[in-house]
Amino acid sequence: MAIWVDADACPNVIKEILFRAAERTQTPLTLVANQPLRVPPSRFIRTLRVEQGFDVADNEIVRQCAAGDLVITADIPLAAEVLAKGGAALNPRGERYSEASIRERLTMRDFMETLRASGVQTGGPDSLSQRDRQQFAAELEKWLLAVKRRQG
């Protein structure tokens, strides 16, 4: 089991949580981005740099992740592809995507895109709160514990 990160848009505070967890649990962590990233020296943490372009990092994550892996992303279509492949997906605010929630989120995303295309100002998400960070850490820990139980 491995953790993949859609790293271009992932907040640094979330990356720090992931770095500590990967080292503590000896879980392979790969950050995929189209720009250079700084990561701490660790045999469990690596970066994978991809070409610039629309969905290039997302496509690489989908190509390389396996059933049972965890993907950290706020990208709803990427999360949907990961779930379809048998993986788990968690956003940086600590929301674990499910088959039911992903359909709802895709519908809302499409609706908001339609509004923006028609000129409506929809605004962006709130900044990451302390509660969001705690929720993320708790959900990550749940996934790590479930993996440990499955591996015996």
Swiss-Prot record:
Belongs to the UPF0178 family. Transmembrane segments: none annotated. This is UPF0178 protein KPN78578_03210. HAMAP family: UPF0178 (MF_00489).
